[in-house]
């Protein structure tokens, strides 16, 4: 099974988030699953890959050439796919992955999460969509989703397509659904 992880590449975040990513990577590797990321070597993105490799897991990165050019690529990946655009990156990650876990992150992470969630709702795929949030950073997002549903902006059942988890074990279990 291939698990895509969306997460921050910011070098200025609290180290607890980087540790979380590393531990998730270890969990994926220990399960003998493959990790798919955006192909970068910094911050949480790099940590999740290092964790997977430390547990003898296989890692796959998908990165646009522009990011390779500024030395963000993780060349230790077992596979590193270099594409031209961010759109191609997301499409390839979606195509080659069997489930998606979103960790804390910024605008890019949220954009990836929303595309996967909406894609599941529209039946472009039927793959698990998981949020791993042990620190409560996505609590306001969860509340917003509930509010949007109560105001009929989100159809009933759409929120149920997201598995909201707080432990690595629960996140990995949700991927196996």
Which residue ranges define each predicted feature?
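A cross-family phosphate/adenosyl-ligand binding-site feature
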Residues: 1-96, 134-176
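Short, structured loop/turn "capping" segments at alpha-beta junctions
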Residues: 59, 124-127
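Active-site/ligand-binding-proximal alpha/beta "capping" segment
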Residues: 88-123, 130
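Short loop-to-beta-strand entry elements in the cores of soluble alpha/beta enzymes
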Residues: 127-135
């Amino acid at each position: 099974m291939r698990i895509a992880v969306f997460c921050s590449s910011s070098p200025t975040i609290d180290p607890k988030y980087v540790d979380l990513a590393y531990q998730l990577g270890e969990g994926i590797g220990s399960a003998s699953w493959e990790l798919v990321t955006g192909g970068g070597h910094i911050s949480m993105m790099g940590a999740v890959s290092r964790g997977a490799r430390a547990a003898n897991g296989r890692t796959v990165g998908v990165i646009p050439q522009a990011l390779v050019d500024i030395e963000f690529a993780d060349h230790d990946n077992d596979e590193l796919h270099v594409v031209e655009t961010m759109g191609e990156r997301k499409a390839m990650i979606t195509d080659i992955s069997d489930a998606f876990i979103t960790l804390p992150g910024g605008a890019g992470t949220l954009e990836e999460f929303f595309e996967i969630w909406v894609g599941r709702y529209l039946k472009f795929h039927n793959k698990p969509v998981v949020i791993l949030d042990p620190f409560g950073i996505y609590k306001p997002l969860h509340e917003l989703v509930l509010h949007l549903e109560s105001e009929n902006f989100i159809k009933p059942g759409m929120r149920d397509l997201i598995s909201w988890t707080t432990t690595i074990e629960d996140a990995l279990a949700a991927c196996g659904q």
